[in-house]
């Protein structure tokens, strides 16, 4: 989060807490992972506005998050911060592997960027010139960047959805993802030169990793993939469930599975995209 938590954050976490408690009661060995996504332009800019460093800014947010989960008696098993050294080590290894095998390449990004959503968009994807996800203004972006070959995995993703009908739930969300892919899946811009608050690309440090490549990798870095902090990857991966808000379902059901396919790693068994709590 880039600011104080809202009720939507609690919605996701309480739902996961209920599931974790139920599974423990059934005798399962549970890994309930939560944490904070701390990099990106949004946080860099908010820290500058507050007159503090990005790390000082996120440290304050993390303290409030942990206080809230304690108040709500959230029974998480592990809390990961994407600024943790072991996580950054894992991300750099993942990025390097994808680059060395040809799934990441250098190019030039020309398009639009939504800072609140941390999303890249083409002209044809905008709705009335605005972000199709949140409806906010986007700004033009033009910079050298690395790209992940997401489009290479379009057919495999569609096959995944067809052969595993429970992979994306509810059904309506799955249909949205299928439509998104069928309109033409573009490669994903996975680095920035204009954003300094991020994990450096190890072989080209003027670039920082796109926040979503960094954030999604937490699911396996928190288990010890690509680092020596933990040794539970083989025990707890693949995950039985990712529980996410509908606004970030696309990253979890398109970009993340494509990355895992490229890494030749197992996919999570299910991704549930819940709706929003709205106050009119």
Segments (PLM) and residue ranges:
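N-terminal, positively charged nucleic-acid-binding surface of large information/translation enzymes
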Residues: 1-167
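Structured secondary-structure scaffolds
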Residues: 1-34, 86-90, 134, 141-280
């Amino acid at each position: 989060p880039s600011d104080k938590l809202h009720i939507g954050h609690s919605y996701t976490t309480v739902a996961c807490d209920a599931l974790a408690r139920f599974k423990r009661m059934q005798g399962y060995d549970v890994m309930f992972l939560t944490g904070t996504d701390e990099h990106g332009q949004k946080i860099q800019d908010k820290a500058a506005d507050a007159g503090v460093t990005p790390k000082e800014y996120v440290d304050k947010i993390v303290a409030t998050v942990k206080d809230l989960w304690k108040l709500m008696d959230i029974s998480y098993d592990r809390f990961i911060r994407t600024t943790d050294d072991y996580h950054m080590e894992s991300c750099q290894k993942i990025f390097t592997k994808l680059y060395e095998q040809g799934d990441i390449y250098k190019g030039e990004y020309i398009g639009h960027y939504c800072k609140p959503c941390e999303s890249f968009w083409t002209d044809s994807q905008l709705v009335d010139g605005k972000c199709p996800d949140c409806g906010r203004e986007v700004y033009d972006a033009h910079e050298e960047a690395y790209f992940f070959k997401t489009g290479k995995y379009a057919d495999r993703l569609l096959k995944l959805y067809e052969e595993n009908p429970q992979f994306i739930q509810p059904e309506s969300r799955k249909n949205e993802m299928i439509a998104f892919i069928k309109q033409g899946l573009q490669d994903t811009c996975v680095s920035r030169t204009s954003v300094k608050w991020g994990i450096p690309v190890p072989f080209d440090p003027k670039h920082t990793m796109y926040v979503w490549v960094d954030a999604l990798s937490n699911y396996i870095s928190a288990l010890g993939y690509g680092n020596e902090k933990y040794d539970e990857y083989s025990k707890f991966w693949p995950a039985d469930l990712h529980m996410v808000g509908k606004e970030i379902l696309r990253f979890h059901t398109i970009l993340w599975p494509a990355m895992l396919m490229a890494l030749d790693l197992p996919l999570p068994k299910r991704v549930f995209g819940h709706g929003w709590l709205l106050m009119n």
